UniProtKB/Swiss-Prot annotation:
Its EC number is 6.3.5.-. HAMAP family: GatC. It comes from Gluconacetobacter diazotrophicus (strain ATCC 49037 / DSM 5601 / CCUG 37298 / CIP 103539 / LMG 7603 / PAl5). The keyword Ligase applies. It is an enzyme of class 6 (ligase). GO terms for molecular function: asparaginyl-tRNA synthase (glutamine-hydrolyzing) activity; ATP binding; glutaminyl-tRNA synthase (glutamine-hydrolyzing) activity. The gene is gatC. It catalyses: L-glutamyl-tRNA(Gln) + L-glutamine + ATP + H2O = L-glutaminyl-tRNA(Gln) + L-glutamate + ADP + phosphate + H(+); L-aspartyl-tRNA(Asn) + L-glutamine + ATP + H2O = L-asparaginyl-tRNA(Asn) + L-glutamate + ADP + phosphate + 2 H(+). One of its GO terms (biological process) is translation. This is Aspartyl/glutamyl-tRNA(Asn/Gln) amidotransferase subunit C. The lineage of its organism: Bacteria, Pseudomonadati, Pseudomonadota, Alphaproteobacteria, Acetobacterales. InterPro entries: Asp/Glu-ADT_sf_sub_c, GatC. PANTHER family: GLUTAMYL-TRNA(GLN) AMIDOTRANSFERASE SUBUNIT C, MITOCHONDRIAL (PTHR15004:SF0). Keywords: ATP-binding, Ligase, Nucleotide-binding, Protein biosynthesis. Belongs to the GatC family. It holds the Pfam family GatC.
């Protein structure tokens, strides 16, 4: 399937995209390329392939629900512009 300039203008108008006439041919080429990829996907034989509806069958690793400090406090505070002890120091924003 190949799009002509009139169809590209119509698609742009429906999508409320303003395009210049100078950009029309570039956009036409991009859209034709996308449609070409879709045509390639339509040629794939998917007989006997069950659709994937989610990852519900995947087993998740479980860990204990324990509160930690992340074991990286010093590394995190090293990125702070100013720190006071184990805390970030920020300018006062409320008077």
């Amino acid at each position: 399937m190949s799009l002509d300039p009139a169809t590209v203008r119509r698609i742009a108008r429906l999508a409320r995209i303003g395009i210049d006439e100078s950009d029309l041919h570039a956009l036409q080429g991009e859209l034709n390329g996308i449609l070409g990829w879709i045509e390639q996907l339509n040629e794939v034989d998917i007989d006997g392939v069950e659709p994937m509806v989610g990852t519900g069958h995947a087993a998740l690793r479980m860990r204990e629900d324990v509160v930690t400090d992340g074991a990286a406090r010093d590394a995190v505070l090293s990125n702070a512009p100013d720190a006071a002890g184990p805390f970030y120091t920020v300018p006062k924003v409320v008077e």
